[in-house]
Curated annotation (Swiss-Prot):
Gene3D superfamilies: PurM-like C-terminal domain (3.90.650.10), PurM-like, N-terminal domain (3.30.1330.10). ATP binds at Y68, K107, N537, G574. Pathway: Purine metabolism; IMP biosynthesis via de novo pathway; 5-amino-1-(5-phospho-D-ribosyl)imidazole from N(2)-formyl-N(1)-(5-phospho-D-ribosyl)glycinamide: step 1/2. One of its GO terms (molecular function) is phosphoribosylformylglycinamidine synthase activity. It is an enzyme of class 6 (ligase). This is Phosphoribosylformylglycinamidine synthase subunit PurL. It comes from Prochlorococcus marinus (strain NATL1A).
């Protein structure tokens, strides 16, 4: 449904006797983030003017954050079905079947705007919110990941944001006892005023009784459980649905305050309560608080809910109905339970130190009815709040935006000619050796080790973490059964998970960049030996009200759809965060890079056969799976210096069109990689990402302490292209001499069965000399000590912060 209204008639409309209200409509609409056309539509549905409480409820529920009014038409095209999918989009989290009576529950959410205002609490409550999404489904939380974006660390403000966000994530996750096992962090000037904080949660359940959120049972009691309700987080959903400005940066009351120790009790109490069989439906109170939980539970169950605010545990005296309804105080849940179970459940929750009250009941009439001080203060159709919400009409431009047309004109021919020992740097017209190019790339915070961040997280709590952060291309945790009655698998199984997005690529081509995000996530999972099974996505974009912004979002959704269909990784749900723009003091608006973060999960049948990225022993041979290094002048468009880290960080150019994404190639490479890992043919695996071949080899050397001898084939291609180009579905593996014969044999066998789109290329061998040596035609190209590589890579972020 699309709503529209002519401004010139609005004053006449609101002053008509039928829709007259006792408040200033214009100022109220501004406060709630609603349009005049929204107000007209609300009046049409109610056949009266809404009171002030009701308008506030519509304000949060019709915000982009809650109803996806700009993105819903695009999201419906995402693939959401598959053989393992048990619960897809629409519930608190997605659920997939991983066999042996076990289900994996997972989702990703953003807390971007709150983290810009108050980084510690904004990030901490982001963790708390995603954990509630997980255990509300009946699953025990087992892991967390995060995807973060900040402005350059040359700015003290960005350093402060980074420190605050990492501290908030660390504090909440560590205190609640859920390991933060991985993630990704990027830095770009577009995020200087608008950092991104995306948190992904995973949970394990071993019962068929998935707890859903749709209410049922006329007159069944509605139970409030958890923390008290205060004035923190007021209007958080509306705040998250508008661009950041100096005014909103100072809007600290819109940021919630979390209590991880109370959340820990809430987790245990809820999981215990679910086992009783008394809980009919459950919904956490996140964005829009009581308003959202009541309206969504009622709408999904096609019933109504009566809520008595006089019974809600209050943190502060004198709270109004409006404040109760819009508060986003943390660690709160709403249950529908079986009649007669109230006292038993009350004792259970009190034992865990939680507030618990019967605050309402399920109604036959499909409304959300709110009572305060003995009077009805709101009475609204549940579907109007949570289901039948407005959809914005946007005209999709039918041609590539001008900014991209200009970027796509760039070609590698515009770079200075390469020499055997280096290149002229366009940024300052000075010569730079290949050694220093590599060291400079490794010192860039987006590429460098994130050890300064990881070491603040407790990633070993629960004792199921198999791979420490940074050791492999994906995080891996052991699946440890919680129930003795389940049939046990013969081998120790695991779950691999990853979050991925090359935002520079998406900025320079939203379609290819988004396809690449899905493909890289699947490649990273395959690099540890995991079979990718499903994704959750977090679409972080700028304003869709601008034609370019909506085009970027549309192209990104199309790219995700294509890649998910090709790689058989359906979407189980996720989050959309729009209006990630910063209004500068001169009134110009700075949009972020479009950043569709892909959270992907995969299944490992035997965790004893996973691969890390470290070389394992000296003299192992180094191979590359995927597209080969070129040996002629004809360039493969699937590999390029365009949009590369080399181009941006060495030459200061963020331009060019990212490489073509060959999804059939990706699929073949992933399958081959998983099989050779399963058969024990390779000892290590690491995909080529930011910085291309040279950076990938350096990372393998740094993590292992071993060196490498790499011999580039004779080629007419540019040296920088061979060393630093990106793309091509390429993965480095290492194996012994005997294993190398097995690798070649297996590749030959599958070649006989069909057409291979990829090759395996021998590049060199692991050495014990503690040096990375790269040569071509007997000319030394790179000769760097591993300790120098390690010091540069490991200390880069710490040095930036403490400079």
């Amino acid at each position: 449904m699309t709503v529209s209204f002519e401004n010139k008639d609005f004053n006449q409309f609101i002053n008509s006797s039928k829709f007259l209200v006792e408040y200033d409509v214009m100022s109220a609409l501004k406060q709630e983030g609603l349009k005049q056309s929204d107000y007209v539509e609300i009046c049409r549905r109610l056949n009266r003017g809404p009171n002030r409480n009701e308008l506030g409820m519509f304000g949060v529920m019709w915000s982009e954050h809650c109803c996806y009014r700009n993105s819903r038409p695009l999201l419906k095209n995402l693939p959401t079905t598959g053989s393992r999918i048990l619960v897809g989009p629409g519930e608190n989290a997605g659920v997939v079947d991983i066999g042996f009576g076990q289900r994996l529950v997972f989702k990703i959410e953003s807390h971007n705007h709150p983290s810009a205002v108050e980084p510690f609490q904004g990030a901490a409550t982001g963790v708390g919110g995603i954990l509630r999404d997980i255990f509300t489904m009946g699953a025990r939380p087992i892991a967390l990941l995060n995807a973060l974006r900040f402005g350059p660390l040359d700015d003290e403000k960005n350093i402060s944001l980074l420190e605050g966000v990492v501290a908030g994530i660390s504090h909440y996750g560590n205190c609640v006892g859920v390991p933060t096992i991985g993630g990704e962090v990027g830095f770009d000037s577009s995020y200087s005023g608008n950092p991104l904080v995306n948190v992904m949660g995973l949970g394990l359940m071993e019962t068929e009784e998935i707890v859903c959120s749709g209410a049922s049972g006329i007159d069944f009691p509605v139970l409030y459980v958890g923390n008290t309700t205060g004035r923190d987080g007021m209007g958080g959903a509306s705040f998250a649905s508008s661009e950041l400005s100096k005014t909103s940066i100072d809007d600290r009351p819109a940021v919630q305050v979390g209590d991880p120790f109370l959340e820990k009790g809430l987790i245990e109490a809820c999981l215990e309560a679910f086992k009783t069989g008394y809980v009919i439906a459950a919904q956490d109170m996140g964005a829009a608080g009581l308003t959202c939980s009541c309206s969504e539970m009622a709408s999904k169950g096609e019933v109504g809910i009566e809520l008595n605010l006089d019974l809600v545990p209050a943190r502060e005296k004198g709270m109004t109905a409006y404040e109760f309804l819009l508060s986003e105080s943390q660690e709160r849940m709403l249950f529908v339970v079986k009649p007669g179970s109230e006292e038993e459940l009350r004792e259970l929750f009190i034992r865990w130190g939680l507030y618990v009250e019967v605050v309402g009941k399920v109604l036959k009439e499909k409304v959300v009815r709110v009572i305060h001080k003995g009077e009805v203060v709101a009475n609204l159709p549940a579907s109007a709040l949570a289901d039948d919400t407005p959809i914005e009409e946007h005209l999709l431009i039918n041609s590539t935006p001008e900014y991209l047309q200009e970027h796509w004109k760039w070609t590698e021919d515009l770079l200075p000619k390469t020499l055997d020992n280096g290149i002229i740097n366009i940024k300052n017209n000075l010569f730079i050796s290949w050694n220093n190019v590599l060291l400079d790339l490794l010192s860039m915070p987006s590429i460098a080790s994130k050890n300064w961040i990881y070491k603040q997280y407790d990633y070993q709590v629960q004792s199921n973490t198999v791979v420490s952060p940074g050791e492999a291309d994906a995080a891996v945790i052991r699946i440890r059964s919680q129930n003795d009655f389940l049939t046990k698998p013969k081998k120790d199984r695991g779950i691999a998970s990853v979050v991925d997005c090359n935002d520079r690529w998406v900025y320079l081509d939203p379609l290819r960049g988004s396809m690449s995000a899905v493909a890289e996530a699947a490649r990273n999972l395959s690099s540890v030996g995991a079979e990718p099974i499903a994704i959750t996505n977090n679409l972080n974009f700028s304003s869709p009200d601008k034609p370019v912004g909506f085009w970027q979002l549309s192209m990104s959704c199309e790219g995700i759809t294509k890649a998910c269909l090709a790689l058989s990784t359906p979407v189980t749900g996720g989050n959309v965060s729009l209006y990630n723009d910063t209004k500068l003091q001169n009134n110009t608006v700075l949009p972020i890079h479009p950043t569709p973060v892909i959270g992907m999960v995969g299944l490992i049948e035997d965790i004893n056969k996973i691969c890390k990225k470290s070389w394992v022993k000296a003299e192992d041979q180094i191979w590359m799976i995927g597209l080969p290094l070129e040996n002629n002048i004809n360039q493969d468009e699937r590999i390029s210096l365009s949009a590369s880290s080399f181009l941006e960080y060495i030459h200061g150019l963020k331009t060019g069109r990212p490489p073509e994404i060959d999804l059939n190639l990706e699929k073949q490479v992933h399958a081959f990689l998983r099989e050779v890992i399963k058969q024990g043919i390779v000892n290590s695996a690491h995909d080529l990402g930011d910085g291309g071949l040279a950076v990938a080899i350096a990372e393998c050397c740094i993590s292992s302490g071993y060196g490498a001898n790499i011999i580039l084939p004779p080629s007419q291609s540019r040296l920088d292209r061979l060393l630093f180009a990106e793309g091509g579905a390429r993965v480095l593996v290492s194996c012994s001499t005997d294993q190398s014969e097995e690798l070649k044999k297996y590749y030959k066998n599958i070649s006989l069965q069909g057409s291979n789109l990829f090759s395996i290329s021998h590049l060199g061998n692991v050495n014990n000399q503690k040096k990375l040596l790269v040569s071509q035609s007997n000319n030394t190209i790179i000769d760097v000590n591993i300790l120098d590589l390690k010091d540069t890579y490991k200390d880069a972020i710490h040095k930036k912060i403490t400079k």
